[in-house]
Regions:
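Terminal RNA-binding accessory module
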Residues: 425-547
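Conserved, mostly hydrophobic/aromatic
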Residues: 218, 238, 255, 313, ...
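Conserved SAM/AdoMet-binding glycine-rich loop
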Residues: 57, 66, 247-395, 403
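Generic beta-strand/beta-sheet core signal
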Residues: 60, 223-224, 256-258, 314-316, ...
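Intrinsically disordered, low-complexity Ser/Thr- and acidic-rich flexible linkers and loops
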Residues: 112, 116, 137-138, 145, ...
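A structural motif corresponding to the C-terminal lobe/cap of the Radical SAM core domain
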Residues: 334-337, 349-467, 523-527
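Intrinsically disordered, low-complexity acidic Ser/Thr-rich regulatory segments
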Residues: 145-148, 161-182, 282-294, 303, ...
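Proteins enriched for Cys/Gly/acidic motifs involved in redox and nucleic-acid/cofactor modification
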Residues: 1-263, 324, 339, 362-372, ...
């Protein structure tokens, strides 16, 4: 979006008070993100009305996409709404929104003060009353009868969203012909090499989107409705962007999408969306021509690019792993020895209710194959606790699995009941206190594992990517000063210590989500270096340069 704005000649500023237009890029993945988006929109409107009435407010992103029909009626104060497909035309939309604001300023009747609580409640109500198709109703019952633990209840009585009162907002919206509304019903946009870019990451690493959208039917997730079906970029296009990034000094390319392991399968002739289970995916992969585009062919071509850099594969789906992918990662030395594979649960009933298209035994076997086939691999995963119907027994199965598998990196989310999802309508919702307690138990188990993983690094020499100078807050959060004093007592980090520490990451650490390596000494920032691990804290390592 920033790249498209700059290409259009729009000047970017961090000072909201000086801007002619404010763009609120929203998230609507979970309720808390949705509420934060609404808060930010209304705060922007209040600041505009108090300080600069000529300033246009534009709402973009997932909230606009998810509530494309209702949001303009609920927020007539906003000057423009744009969806995911309109990113490349944002410059034109900004110009129209500024003109719209000028027209609105002449209409005093449009002064409406909205309540953020009222709007958030209304959006939740819209999703609760959304009619489910017959197929969705049938699918919502999956994984219940087999285990006999819980029942899914889909409300039979629904009030049409069109009949719910929106009198004030609808009236204002109908009077306001100047509001810009540009949101397609189902997104199809995907950036390519020609799409303008304005990178927000440091120069030494970048995210490279290889696909957009998702074909998976997970019962807890709203993403397919907001982002559309899975659609892959061409391999040629991705490789061209990767080469440009490497030429610009990038040392780490992080491949991202909603499902990276599905990459390329949608490009084959007569592609069907119903390729989600391991069996169907494996059969489809085997039927591909030798020169077909897949995640394996992409990794191999990226690996062949000249230069010293890492390729990191993020957001893989367990149902879409193949023996070929394991062999490809093992063969490609530039692909980081790191796998991001969100599993979400391990108990059979939970996997089926989540519609994860995998089984407990399949996951156990897959992890064994990955670890055997890629020596030195670091496994990162995430789990959801407190999903509807999660009994004490099914939770204990998950907890035992975490203790036994000993993931190098692990995150835990408490289930968030989302309107508009099948899981949001399921019976057996878990109290928040129970969900939080279960999260704490899993993280306590992982804390012990993480310390052991860190301890196993001590004495080793590894390759790292130097991120920058460590500041006092980072050193205190990592408890580095206590390590300096033999873990005997807390001690304030001295200025000398601050000046002497750098932050780096190893192959086992993705940006932002994993641990750090604190290096005592001086090394070039944004470059690879070899260090020796001399200590550790709970989740982080302490190192010194290898001469």
């Amino acid at each position: 979006m920033l790249g498209s704005l700059m290409k259009s000649g729009v000047e970017i500023t961090n000072d909201a008070a000086q801007a002619d237009a404010l763009i609120v890029n929203t998230c609507s993945f979970i309720d808390s993100a949705q509420e934060e988006s609404v808060d930010t929109i209304l705060e922007s409107v209040e600041l505009r009305d108090a300080n600069r009435r000529g300033q246009a407010v534009i709402v973009s992103g997932c909230l606009s996409q998810r509530f494309r029909e209702e949001l303009p009626k609920l927020l007539p104060e906003v000057d423009a709404f744009m969806g995911i497909d309109q990113v490349a035309r944002v410059g034109d939309i900004v110009g129209k929104a500024i003109a719209s604001r000028a027209e609105k300023n002449g209409n005093e009747k449009l002064k409406i003060k909205n309540s953020k609580t009222k709007i958030s409640a209304r959006l939740n109500e819209l999703e609760k009353n959304r009619d489910l198709s017959a197929r969705e109703k049938e699918e919502s019952l999956r994984g219940t009868d087999k285990f006999g633990k819980t029942k899914t209840v889909v409300a039979a009585s629904r009030e049409s969203a069109a009949n719910l009162s929106l009198a004030e907002g609808t009236a204002a919206f109908s009077r306001n012909a100047a509001t810009i509304f540009d949101v397609t019903s189902r997104p199809v946009f995907i950036p390519d090499f020609e799409t303008p870019r304005f990178r927000l990451t440091p120069k030494h690493f970048a995210y490279l989107k290889i696909a957009e959208g998702c074909n998976h039917p997970c019962s807890f997730c709203i993403i397919p409705r907001m982002r559309g079906s899975h659609r892959s970029r061409t391999q040629k296009d991705i490789v061209a962007e990767a080469k440009a990034l490497i030429a610009d000094g990038v040392k780490e390319i992080n491949l991202i999408s909603q499902d990276s392991t599905y990459y390329g399968l949608d490009l084959r002739p007569n592609h069907s969306r119903a390729i989600s289970s391991p069996e169907k995916f494996s059969a489809a992969a085997k039927s591909l021509a030798a020169d077909a585009t897949t995640i394996c062919s992409l990794l191999r071509e990226l690996n062949s690019i000249k230069g010293d850099f890492w390729i990191r594969l993020l957001y893989t789906h367990p149902a879409h792993w193949t023996d070929e992918l394991i062999q490809t990662i093992a063969d490609c030395k530039k692909v980081a020895r790191y796998v991001d594979i969100p599993l979400q649960h391990i108990h059979e009933n939970m996997l089926e209710r989540m519609r994860r298209e995998t089984s407990q035994q399949y996951i156990v076997d897959l992890i064994q194959k990955i670890r055997a086939g890629i020596p030195g691999i670091a496994l990162r995963t995430t789990f959801i606790v407190g999903f509807p119907g999660e009994t004490e027994s099914s939770f204990e199965t998950l907890l035992d699995f975490v203790r036994e598998t000993k993931f190098e990196r692990l995150g835990v989310f408490t289930y968030s009941q989302e309107d508009g999802t099948l899981a949001g309508k399921m019976a057996g919702q878990i109290p928040d206190k129970v969900k939080q307690k279960r999260r704490e138990l899993v993280m306590a188990a992982q804390h012990k594992i993480a310390r052991q993983v860190s301890e196993n690094f001590v004495g080793r020499e590894i390759k790292v990517l130097v991120e920058g100078q460590a500041n006092e807050k980072q050193l205190q959060q990592a408890n580095v000063s206590s390590w300096e004093h033999g873990l005997i007592r807390e001690a304030e980090t001295s200025k000398l210590q601050i000046q002497n520490y750098l932050i780096a990451r190893g192959e086992a650490d993705a940006p932002d989500i994993d641990g750090r390596i604190y290096i005592r000494g001086r090394l070039p920032i944004g470059e690879f270096a070899k260090v020796k691990i001399i200590g550790h804290t709970d989740y982080d390592l302490i190192a010194e340069p290898v001469a």
